[in-house]
């Protein structure tokens, strides 16, 4: 039903939106198939809360980003190098380790208070934080706007990053990546450029993260590692466990990306991207055309133009 890129949150379409669970059942899918479809769902923590229109949006985006005329490109040594390079072009360095506790404004300026007690004055502020982190900052938002920050779900993701010294999967005729219906979710392996080693990432999605998120870091890492060795015993001798990342437990994130419940985006999306006086909002949750890093950059351009219009 999405004939235009930005139509996914159109109120008329949102009025007929439903959960992926309801949609699949209406189409006659058996429960066993629905359970399988819901495994490793990246677009909702469970199918009952997954917007069917959001899935159409994802399909449309994949269509725009693929095709014979489009080349697949990667950032050398990881995606983080891209924002680092952008930061390197700024006139002033990015200040790290300075959490913001409050943003207040008058008719002529904004005042940003840091955890250290330092206060910054500016003509305008662009807030790009994920909504769970934004909730922790005192901004004197209208009550309805402040309440909305806590009403949008964020995707639960746990990642265990490992280093593999040798491609153990080749002897078994495997391809090196796995899609499972077990605790492990999905497993991705990628060669490390210039070496014979591989990065391996265990990627667990949605409500399957709940039982792991209540464990301490050591117990969580051990639980995932044991499941990994049980699935692929040959991996144990050549695989070292590196970093555990639990997005929902990170106070500066609260989850991997924003999720829209059925029908929610019709009103919530435009409300969250609207400026509040001299405070402007960006981040992937405010983007219209794209998701992820592309959406974050799209939203940054939009917010910058909004500030320029204010200050013109």
Range-by-range predicted roles:
Residues 54-63, 119, 157-159, 199:
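Intrinsic-disorder/low-complexity, polar/charged segments enriched in Ser/Thr/Lys/Arg/Asp/Glu/Gln
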Residues 30-38, 167-173, 237:
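A short alpha-helix-loop-beta-strand transition element characteristic
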Residues 98-107, 114-174, 235:
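Central helical "cap/lid" subdomain
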Residues 9, 13, 71-79, 118, ...:
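Aromatic-acidic/polar surface patches that form glycan- and anion
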Residues 109, 156, 172-312:
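Conserved flavin/dinucleotide-binding core of flavoenzymes
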Residues 21, 25, 83-87, 101, ...:
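Non-transmembrane alpha-helical segments in soluble domains
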Residues 2-99, 106-107, 128, 138, ...:
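Active-site/ligand-binding neighborhood in enzyme catalytic cores
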